[in-house]
């Protein structure tokens, strides 16, 4: 197997909603034709209509993608590796809550209930809540994504 010095990222324009299908077809073609010039196929989760290929050159991308039904073409230019990692990495903006804050539970079995934050476990991305709307004190641990601060 050759060690290729240059690896660039190329973007395929595809029909929206068909990104996974195109990626699977590309993967199958790469395996069956034993193509060593394509190193990875990336489907960005938040961007519809595009598939990213890590390859040695645009000629390889055009060759492997020719004849696939939902491929519209190769976008002009290259994209940087930092942009690819930004598209792929999961970055969720977690609500900023601290001990003593009033929050509302937005999902799960306690959805819609008001609660007070007892403790924030930032390593686990969880909060321990005291549900205010129950007749007796109930403490529950929920993921941080399931609460939002109450605006007052």
UniProtKB/Swiss-Prot annotation:
Gene3D superfamilies: 2.30.30.30, NusG, N-terminal domain (3.30.70.940)
Example GO biological process: regulation of DNA-templated transcription
Every KOW domain range: 99-129
Record's GO cellular component terms: ribosome
Origin: domain of life: Archaea
UniProt-recorded Gene Ontology molecular function terms: structural constituent of ribosome; translation elongation factor activity
Matches recorded under InterPro entries: KOW (IPR005824), NGN-domain (IPR005100), NGN-like_dom (IPR006645), NGN_dom_sf (IPR036735), Rib_uL2_dom2 (IPR014722), Ribosomal_uL24_CS (IPR005825), Spt5_arc (IPR011590), Translation_prot_SH3-like_sf (IPR008991)
Summary of the function given for this chain in its UniProt record: Stimulates transcription elongation.
Family: Belongs to the archaeal Spt5 family.
Assembly mode: Heterodimer composed of Spt4 and Spt5. Interacts with RNA polymerase (RNAP).
Protein's name according to its UniProt entry: Transcription elongation factor Spt5
Organism of this sequence: Sulfolobus acidocaldarius (strain ATCC 33909 / DSM 639 / JCM 8929 / NBRC 15157 / NCIMB 11770)
Gene that encodes it: spt5
């Amino acid at each position: 197997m050759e060690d290729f010095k240059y690896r660039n990222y190329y973007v395929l324009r595809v029909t929206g909603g068909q990104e996974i299908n195109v990626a699977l077809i590309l993967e199958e073609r790469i395996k069956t034709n034993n193509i060593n010039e394509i190193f990875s196929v990336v489907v960005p989760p938040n961007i519809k209509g595009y598939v990213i290929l890590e390859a040695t050159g645009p000629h390889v991308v055009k060759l492997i993608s020719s004849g696939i039904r939902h491929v519209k073409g190769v976008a002009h230019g290259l994209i940087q590796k930092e942009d690819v990692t930004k598209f792929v990495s999961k970055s969720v903006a977690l609500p900023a809550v601290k001990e003593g804050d009033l929050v509302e539970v937005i999902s799960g079995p306690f959805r819609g209930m008001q609660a007070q934050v007892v403790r924030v476990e930032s390593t686990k991305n969880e909060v321990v809540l005291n549900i205010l709307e129950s007749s007796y004190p109930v403490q529950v641990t929920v993921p941080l994504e399931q609460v939002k601060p109450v605006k007052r």
